[in-house]
């Protein structure tokens, strides 16, 4: 499946947004990929996650568990796990730190893949992988639908994606004036209380 076919699914779902966005990383961008818009369509999400599951199998072989960070990774992780026939669990932020809740556990040396919706800087992925390691899981890789860094994000393990996209981002101190003229939207879930 080509990257253009992947992007077409996101466009069909109305998931490629334009405006002034503050990303979970704190960076500013004129474009945002709202993966939840894709995940609201079961046929599209199943199709995309089936393709991602194939890439995971080709790259990493057999795994035991899919682990995702809430919120964005929950549906993607579940659907990928369904395609692979393995369980899926997720970490939730409690006072800014990832924690396992809801009776979830990771048995020692369980072969895990961390699955996200979108990777930009890799911060959420690294935090989730660190949390898996603290629970004695064996993280053998990571996967996402879209890699916004075009391979530039370091998540600490090999990362596979369905598509890579470079979308320019700006530090708060370096926002272009044309972008500053647009009202800010904060669509991510990192700082929700």
Where are these predicted regions, by residue range?
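PRPP-associated nucleotide enzymes
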Residues: 1-193
């Amino acid at each position: 499946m080509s990257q253009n076919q992947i992007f077409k699914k996101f466009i069909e779902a109305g998931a490629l947004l334009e405006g002034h966005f503050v990303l979970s990383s704190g960076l500013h961008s004129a474009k945002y990929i709202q993966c939840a818009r894709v995940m609201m369509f079961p046929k599209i999400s199943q199709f995309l996650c089936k393709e991602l599951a194939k890439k995971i199998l080709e790259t990493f072989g057999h795994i035991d568990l899919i682990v995702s960070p809430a919120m964005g990774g929950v549906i993607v992780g579940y659907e990928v796990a369904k395609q692979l026939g393995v369980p899926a669990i997720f970490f939730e932020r409690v006072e800014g730190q990832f924690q396992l809740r809801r009776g979830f556990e990771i048995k020692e040396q369980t072969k895990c893949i961390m699955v996200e919706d979108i990777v930009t800087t890799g911060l959420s992925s690294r935090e989730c992988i660190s949390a898996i390691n603290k629970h004695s899981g064996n993280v053998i890789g990571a996967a996402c639908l879209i890699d916004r860094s075009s391979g530039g994000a370091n998540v600490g393990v090999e990362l596979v994606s369905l598509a890579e996209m470079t979308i320019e981002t700006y530090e708060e101190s370096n926002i272009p004036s044309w972008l500053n003229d647009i009202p800010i939207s904060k669509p991510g879930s990192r700082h929700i209380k």
